């Protein structure tokens, strides 16, 4: 008996111990399956349905590891102030035709979504694919587990891919990792605002991308990243004088491994404003970004990065202030009406405001654009600058510095850097950077677009700047517009050429190889650097001076010109320019006591020298000596093709027929 009691007591003790141990252990991680029903997560409580159809309300998840998986075309997920994992989750509610059906995924408060596997979320009418349901807290999408998690989020009509639903803003959104694709529904952003309505909405703000590979495509009139369709609220009009939504602001992209591709919908920016929406404070650092604005075949494009375009409701088109690009690799482009980086089409101003420049001087303006280091290529659509204003937009307070490498190409009627068609370009500063700027037809290389003014251009430090003016052009109506200036004004009606302005070059460091080369509206290649000190004079020519040129050689040489910094021909001024010919070496040497000099003529004049036996021509200036092989040079064009060999302090440059051929300098 005592033995049996002892055994019973032992069994009881073991049982009690097991129960105590079991109650102290946390619940194991649990997967919640969307195919069984809706899933609602509120902090650490989960409401769900299991595979047997049993419903659980506010069941506490002890370990906080909440994984949602499975496939459904009718059930939804809502997350509030919680951290969840999407694992191979597929929800397709795209067939939903009423907004009352709700978003496929709704997120509120401070919440995060970890991406594992392949996840695809699609909402129906009026909702974002992943909808930021309130303005409280930040929604974060991440791949902290580094398992190459992916997400494709598709908005329904009026809903962003990730962000706001119809009539709602999309704000406080962070993406820190994963392969993320966000496709906006009609009139909504890829990431950001939904479509605006008469009661507001449509703005996209406080959007941060700090990691991952992100692709964002706006729906019609929605930005890739930023604002939805502001024109849905009638945009800027005479009655309301209000943009009504579509703004993209406080957008930050950073991280060396971050890659972002953004495509705006019709009349919207790639990154920035939706249709009729402006943009404010866009920062891109250390990352790779490709961003394009688009039109709807009517020339109303938004910018690649910046403001949206003008829409049918009378929107003015988006201006932009405060774009900062630092140590990033950025390619930005736009269709007709939008700048590569800057503002979108502002032509709504013409329709609604005959005196728009006086009544709305800041609409469509691109200002406070700073590029510091990195590589940037910006191409404007027709009527727009590469960097600066879109159609009717001005570009001002543009700064390029800190060894930036920038290429800016204006579309037809736009400046390379400065104003779009009808827009001015002012307060443009370039320091210690490599810049190439080309204007479109009638646009300045740097300055005003067609009919616009250019002023206050400063170039300093060890900058190397190459500028090409836009040529003159004729409209189908027969109206002729003159060529734009290299640096200065755009061309005007009646073939009036853009007036050149003198840039402030007092701060250029010529000893550090700084210079500026540009073509003026007469297609003359100009080179400007500060004057360098002349070398000490040496009147002794020695006993080995070359003999004087023969009469026939002088005749051939007279077809060439040597121009100084003021473009005057100094070839016949023997106190400055001398020529000698070494018949044994067949070398014609032209010496000019100048720091800046241009040897120019036609290839026909060089062929005349070849007929005299010359095979090589040398230009010797105060700080530089360069030689050209005439056979190589004359093979590049016909008799009337113009060549120019430019010496800027110690730097030579050769152009033939308007194209650079520095490879032929010896």
Language-model features: where?
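Long, contiguous ectodomains of secretory-pathway proteins
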Residues: 69, 80-87, 92-94, 99-101, ...
């Amino acid at each position: 008996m005592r033995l049996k009691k002892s055994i019973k007591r032992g069994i009881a003790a073991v049982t009690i111990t097991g129960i105590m141990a079991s109650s102290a252990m946390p619940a194991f991680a649990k997967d919640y399956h969307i195919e069984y029903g809706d899933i609602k997560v509120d902090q650490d409580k989960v409401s769900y349905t299991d595979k047997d159809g049993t419903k659980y309300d506010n069941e506490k998840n002890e370990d906080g590891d909440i994984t949602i998986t499975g496939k459904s075309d009718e059930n939804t997920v809502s997350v509030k102030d919680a951290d969840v994992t999407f694992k191979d989750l597929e929800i397709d509610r795209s067939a939903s035709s009423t907004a009352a059906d709700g978003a496929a995924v709704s997120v509120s408060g401070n919440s995060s979504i970890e991406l594992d596997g392949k996840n695809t979320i699609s909402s129906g009418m009026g909702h974002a694919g992943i909808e930021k349901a309130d303005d409280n807290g930040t929604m974060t999408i991440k791949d902290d587990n580094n398992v190459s998690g992916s997400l494709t989020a598709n908005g329904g009509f009026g809903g962003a891919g990730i962000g706001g639903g119809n009539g709602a803003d999309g704000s406080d959104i962070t993406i820190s990792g994963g392969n993320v694709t966000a496709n906006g529904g009609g009139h909504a952003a890829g990431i950001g605002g939904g479509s605006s309505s008469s009661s507001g909405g449509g703005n996209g703000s406080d959007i941060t991308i700090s990691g991952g590979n992100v692709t964002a495509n706006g729906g019609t009139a929605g930005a890739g990243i930023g604002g939805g369709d502001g024109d849905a609220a009638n945009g800027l009009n005479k009655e309301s004088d209000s943009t009504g939504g579509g703004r993209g602001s406080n957008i930050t992209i950073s991280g060396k491994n971050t890659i972002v591709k953004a495509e705006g919908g019709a009349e919207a920016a790639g990154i920035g404003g939706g249709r009729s929406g402006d943009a404010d404070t866009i920062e891109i650092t250390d990352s790779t970004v490709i961003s394009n604005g688009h039109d709807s075949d009517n020339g109303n494009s938004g910018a690649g990065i910046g403001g949206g375009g003008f829409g049918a409701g009378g929107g003015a088109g988006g201006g932009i202030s405060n774009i900062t690009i630092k140590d990033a690799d950025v390619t930005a482009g736009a269709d007709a009406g939008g700048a590569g980086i800057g503002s979108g089409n502002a032509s709504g101003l013409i329709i609604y405001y005959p005196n728009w420049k006086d009544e709305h001087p800041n609409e469509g303006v691109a200002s406070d654009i700073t590029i510091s280091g990195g590589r940037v290529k910006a191409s404007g659509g027709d009527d727009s600058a590469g960097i600066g204003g879109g159609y009717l937009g001005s570009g001002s307070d543009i700064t390029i510095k800190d060894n930036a490498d920038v290429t800016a190409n204006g579309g037809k009627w736009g400046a390379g850097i400065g104003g779009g068609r009808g827009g001015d370009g002012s307060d443009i500063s370039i320091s210690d950077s490599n810049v190439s700027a080309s204007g479109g037809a009638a646009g300045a290389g740097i300055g005003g677009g067609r009919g616009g003014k250019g002023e206050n251009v400063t170039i300093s430090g060890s900058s190397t700047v190459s500028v090409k003016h836009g040529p003159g052009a004729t409209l189908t109506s027969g109206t002729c517009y003159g060529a734009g200036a290299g640096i200065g004004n755009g061309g005007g009606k009646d073939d009036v050429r853009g007036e050149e302005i003198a840039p402030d070059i007092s701060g250029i460091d010529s000893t550090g190889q700084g210079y500026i080369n540009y073509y003026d509206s007469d297609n003359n290649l100009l080179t400007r650097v500060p004057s360098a000190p002349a070398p000490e004079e040496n009147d002794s020519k020695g006993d080995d001076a070359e003999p004087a040129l023969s009469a026939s050689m002088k005749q051939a040489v007279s077809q060439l010109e040597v121009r100084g910094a003021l473009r005057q021909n100094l070839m016949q001024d023997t106190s400055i320019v001398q020529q000698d010919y070494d018949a044994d070496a067949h070398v014609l040497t032209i010496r000019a006591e100048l720091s800046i000099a241009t040897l120019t003529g036609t290839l026909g004049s060089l062929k005349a020298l070849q007929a005299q036996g010359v095979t090589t021509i040398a230009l010797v200036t105060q700080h530089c000596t360069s030689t050209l092989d005439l056979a190589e040079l004359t093979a590049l064009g016909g008799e009337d093709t113009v060549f120019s060999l430019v010496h800027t302090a110690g730097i030579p440059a050769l152009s033939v027929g308007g194209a650079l051929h520095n490879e032929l300098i010896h």
